[in-house]
């Protein structure tokens, strides 16, 4: 392929990504037959994905029960996240997970001033399957396996309850690495469509459950984004984090204060003291003609679409755009460093979003000439 041809091909894919990203997940095209949706997913799956029919069935089912438009753009968005998070392995292995888990136990023991010999003795106790907890933890390869060990440890050993306060420290799992807390909250508000194996937590680690909750987290909320990459950033950083980061950028212009563009509009520690973003808005209360309580109420809508309708949001952008003499972007990828015992190098939300966006572009390219 010539240089010119390569440039034209790259430009075509870029245009396809932009056009696809403009589609709103909740806007439905004419209804498609389920078998047609499954067939398209099979075609869109990357080379090397095993059990293509099974993946297609679970993905199509999630879109159906969540009532999300099965557009090529939306399907590719889900496939891109699955590819990035698990490479289409329902219960992906985590390198060195046993070592990571033992280090976390030791860290928590130190926090609670529990001597090391007490921890070592507790881990020699035989678990429900006859093996010691220490042996089971050393042998775990996946988060599902580790979650089950922690469930057992918390239920049967007093030290487990002391260290983990009845809260399983495995927070994400499954093929889309979705948050267990999000899944449990979602299941309380919406009927889970499949039979539950003991708990919603365990469903997260299944292919069908992980896809269902992951697709809900990615696409089942309204967001006025012009590119899908901002949903990928939100998937990593939280609902509307990209919109909120753009608001913080506008607020920095309007207030003259330096702000972290992390998408967090209020302080999430104990929630009582105002954070930097709230203080910056308060500094403009006279100019914006809003009171401190009004500011707080507006910022508390930061995880909903309704924040955009508040006086705070609209007046901050109006002031910032007047000062900047230009129209400001309404979405920015949040500037967040990713932290987890599983992460061994410097990663950010931007790194995640761009990696997923590249997979999304590749999926759209596989789709061919058009986006349904």
Regions found by a protein language model. Give the residues of each.
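Sec-dependent signal peptide hydrophobic core
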Residues: 8-12
């Amino acid at each position: 392929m010539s240089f010119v041809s390569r440039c034209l091909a790259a430009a075509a894919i870029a245009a396809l990504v932009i056009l696809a990203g403009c589609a709103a997940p909740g806007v439905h095209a004419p209804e498609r037959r389920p078998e047609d949706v499954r067939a398209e997913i099979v075609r869109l799956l990357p080379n090397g994905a095993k059990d293509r029919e099974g993946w297609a069935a679970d993905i199509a089912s999630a879109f159906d029960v969540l009532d999300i438009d099965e557009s090529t753009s939306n399907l590719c968005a889900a496939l891109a996240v699955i590819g990035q998070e698990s490479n289409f392995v329902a219960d992906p292995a985590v390198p060195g997970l046993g070592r990571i888990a033992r280090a976390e136990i030791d860290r928590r023991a130190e926090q609670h001033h529990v001597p090391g010999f007490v921890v070592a003795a507790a881990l020699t106790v035989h678990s429900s399957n006859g093996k010691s907890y220490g042996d089971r933890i050393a042998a775990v390869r996946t988060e599902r396996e580790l979650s089950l060990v922690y469930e057992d440890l918390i239920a049967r050993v007093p030290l487990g309850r002391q260290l983990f306060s009845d809260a399983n420290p495995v927070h994400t799992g499954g093929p889309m690495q979705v948050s267990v807390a999000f899944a449990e909250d979602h299941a309380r508000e919406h009927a889970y469509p499949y039979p539950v194996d003991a708990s919603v937590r365990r469903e997260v680690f299944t292919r069908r459950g992980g896809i269902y909750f992951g697709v809900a987290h990615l696409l089942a909320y309204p967001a006025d984004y012009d590119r899908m990459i901002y949903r990928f950033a939100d998937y990593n950083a939280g609902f509307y984090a990209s919109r909120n980061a753009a608001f913080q950028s506008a607020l920095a212009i309007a207030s003259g204060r330096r702000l972290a563009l992390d998408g967090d509009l209020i302080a999430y520690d104990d929630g009582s003291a105002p954070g930097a973003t709230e203080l910056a808005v308060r500094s403009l209360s006279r100019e914006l003609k809003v009171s401190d309580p009004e500011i707080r109420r507006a910022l508390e809508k930061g995880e909903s679409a309704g924040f955009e309708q508040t006086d705070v949001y609209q007046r901050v952008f109006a002031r910032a755009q007047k000062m900047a003499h230009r129209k400001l972007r309404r979405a920015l990828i949040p500037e967040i460093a990713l932290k987890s015992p599983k992460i061994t190098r410097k990663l950010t939300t931007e790194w995640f979003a761009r990696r997923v966006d590249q997979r999304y572009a590749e999926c759209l390219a596989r789709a061919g000439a058009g986006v349904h």
